[in-house]
Amino acid sequence: MKAYFIAILTLFTCIATVVRAQQMSELENRIDSLLNGKKATVGIAVWTDKGDMLRYNDHVHFPLLSVFKFHVALAVLDKMDKQSISLDSIVSIKASQMPPNTYSPLRKKFPDQDFTITLRELMQYSISQSDNNACDILIEYAGGIKHINDYIHRLSIDSFNLSETEDGMHSSFEAVYRNWSTPSAMVRLLRTADEKELFSNKELKDFLWQTMIDTETGANKLKGMLPAKTVVGHKTGSSDRNADGMKTADNDAGLVILPDGRKYYIAAFVMDSYETDEDNANIIARISRMVYDAMR
């Protein structure tokens, strides 16, 4: 009798696996149809709570842009955890650390002056508001961009590279391509940060994900077509355009929680796009909705 039940369970497991594989294949076909004729390279990865993975253009190295602020945050929190540093610890910022020619709500609040701020606030500026100056201050605090790159690799994440700060990425159009990731490497990092206990202080993990949920940028991307109350913790990225009108990247990556509590992780990267900003966001939003519907 026991062998019979084991056989039945195995059969149902196999059937469920086949059904999920078919769903992923159908989803990939729908993405193909959506992208037909689009002047952009699009990469997608989805990792479900059952371990199913969708990979679309996963061989491509996509420039991360501000999505890398998630990587930075993990390294900063790792240092804080190991040194028992509180989120409410105060750091001193020099006016010289706040260059003017970059996106920085923090600089608008403290123009041309020295000031103090808590690490909590600094990380909220970097993640939720995607402040470039806050990000570079945190990179320095964590030990530099190479240290952050090495730390993420130690989490068993490969197929990515970080070598540029925000200031470095602004040095040339080519520099933005040096911070890159495959879509699947991004969702692996998201899942690692969510499911593993990277920090002994649970408050740090809770803070990170709440800050991701509080993200103010890119509401028209992953969240754009999802039901209004869907919980999404995400980090966006966006570049300028070159003289030919090509946009290096429009990105969004994060965690989506379904109404029944199940989760999935998704990265949507749009690279070298001649589509409008609205079209880029619409591509991400429509794919996000396709995934959401397939997961329910």
Swiss-Prot record:
Disulfide bonds listed in the record: none
UniProt-annotated binding residues for substrate: K235, T236, G237
Domain of life: Bacteria
GO biological-process terms attached to the record: beta-lactam antibiotic catabolic process; response to antibiotic
Enzyme class, spelled out: hydrolase
Enzyme Commission number(s): 3.5.2.6
Active site: S66
Gene3D superfamilies, alphabetized: DD-peptidase/beta-lactamase superfamily
Catalytic activity: a beta-lactam + H2O = a substituted beta-amino acid
More details: The class A beta-lactamase family has a specific amino-acid numbering system, sometimes called Ambler or ABL numbering and often misspelt as Amber. A multiple sequence alignment was used to derive a consensus sequence and then the consensus was numbered taking into account insertions and deletions. This allows use of identical numbers, e.g. for active site residues, despite differences in protein length. UniProt always uses natural numbering of residues, hence there appear to be differences in numbering between this entry and some papers.
Family: Belongs to the class-A beta-lactamase family.
Name of the protein in its database record: Beta-lactamase
Species for this entry: Bacteroides uniformis
